[in-house]
């Protein structure tokens, strides 16, 4: 059994880098780039990754961003640290995908739910709930796509934590993040873990 697996959600240029279509400054991005990624590179740890394809059409959300083949779609996670194949979602919840997800094309399909394929991706990437001690999630944003991912993992029986320094709420406000990670609804499905706690967990026998 693996002690833990890392899962990054939506750390893409359109969300995380100045000039992105949906960019807001969030301190966690600096932490990931300057502290966390160098740490996992030194430790040789792979990162599982979920990214978004938010091209139109997407009923209920008129944003048009994270377009495959464009800069805004690209992830901040270095290719050499990425573990296996990315899962590409089309809504907040990772069970939503589309025909042509991640493929540069003019007419991508409408979003649809595919929980079976998402579950198969999880099994291939991190194993079943009995194969991994915990899944540590980070990325953007804690109160939207990260929360939706945490819920989906918890409902499938995984133990889930969120790396507090490596996520932010949509506004980027640190007091709001602290409140969000310390109580409901977040604590119904996951718990916050600090970078120091994660380092100790990895050091004690990943």
Which residue ranges define each predicted feature?
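Active-site micro-motifs of SAM-dependent methyltransferase domains
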Residues: 13, 17, 56
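Acidic/histidine-rich helix-loop elements
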Residues: 16-27
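A broad, low-specificity signal for short, low-complexity segments enriched in glycine/proline
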Residues: 8-10, 49
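A short acidic, glycine/proline-enriched capping/turn motif at secondary-structure boundaries
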Residues: 54-57, 92-94
